[in-house]
A protein has these predicted regions:
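Extracytoplasmic
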Residues: 24-57, 75
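Short hydrophobic/alpha-helical segments at membrane-entry points of transmembrane helices
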Residues: 27, 112-118
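A generic transmembrane-helix signature of 12-TM secondary carrier transporters
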Residues: 95, 99-102, 117-118, 183-190
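Residue-level signature of mid-helix packing/kink "hotspots" within the transmembrane helices
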Residues: 40, 68-76, 159-160
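Helix-loop-helix hairpin linking two adjacent transmembrane segments in secondary transporters
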Residues: 142, 150-201
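Conserved MFS/SLC helix-loop-helix module at the cytosolic interface between two early adjacent transmembrane helices
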Residues: 73-112
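Cytoplasmic helix-loop-helix junction between adjacent transmembrane helices
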Residues: 118-155
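Flexible cytoplasmic inter-helical loops of multi-pass small-molecule transporters
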Residues: 2, 6, 194-214
């Protein structure tokens, strides 16, 4: 009887572990899919947007510099955030920042608002660039090469597809629709990340074994 109960408990634990890893896998890949989309969905539309909102080539140049600047800032602040809040909660916050920035900028009618909210989205994505590799190491240490390949493949898809579809969508439905279409990806990433954070509660700060360091 004791052996049977032990076997059943082991099977339940193994099944829960598999479900947990599948949830983390979905969370990582969905976030990876949008780590470049705020840039590549916007860049092809800047000239069209500038005609409606009213900014010139100098501002378009500023938009071009934002990814480098915000990714650099993210690289500086992320180690402190993960040290304080843990990898999972920091990643969830990054997803939320990406969603808010990408969604809210579609309603902007001012250059300043578009710039600020793009910065917020880019900061979230920059944090994602930093935290995903250690998350892969934490949850898939036995399959780092495979997971890294999957992550890079999805990242490339998220870089290429928005750039290819931005102008056709904008021509058909307007630039705001074209931008908001790609908000659906980080929104989809929210649910699994909320689940990961809940499952990790009580452990996310104590375990720093795979966290990024400055």
């Amino acid at each position: 009887m004791t052996a049977t109960l032990r076997d059943e408990t082991h099977m339940i634990s193994a099944a829960a572990l598999r479900r947990g890893r599948l949830m983390v896998l979905a969370a990582i890949l969905l976030f990876a899919l949008c780590l470049r989309s705020a840039v590549t969905s916007l860049s092809p539309l800047l000239t069209q947007i500038s005609h409606e909102i009213g900014f010139g080539s100098a501002v378009i140049g500023v938009f071009g510099m934002l990814p480098t600047a915000m990714f650099a800032i993210a690289g500086l602040v992320t180690p402190a955030l993960t040290e304080r809040f843990g990898l999972e909660r920091t990643t969830l916050a990054a997803v939320v920042a990406t969603v808010i920035g990408m969604a809210a900028r579609t309603a902007m009618n001012s250059t300043g608002g578009l710039l600020v909210l793009s910065c917020l989205a880019l900061l979230g994505m920059g944090i994602g660039n930093v935290v995903i590799p250690p998350l892969v190491k934490r949850y898939f240490s036995h399959r780092v090469a495979l997971m890294s390949a999957a992550y890079l493949t999805v990242l490339q898809i998220g870089t290429t597809v928005p750039a290819l579809t931005a102008v056709p969508l904008a021509d058909a439905y307007g630039w705001r629709f074209s931008l908001v279409a790609w908000v659906l990806v980080p929104v989809a990433a929210l649910l699994p990340w909320i689940g990961v954070v809940i499952a990790r509660r009580g452990h996310d700060v104590e375990d720093h074994s795979a966290e990024p360091h400055a």
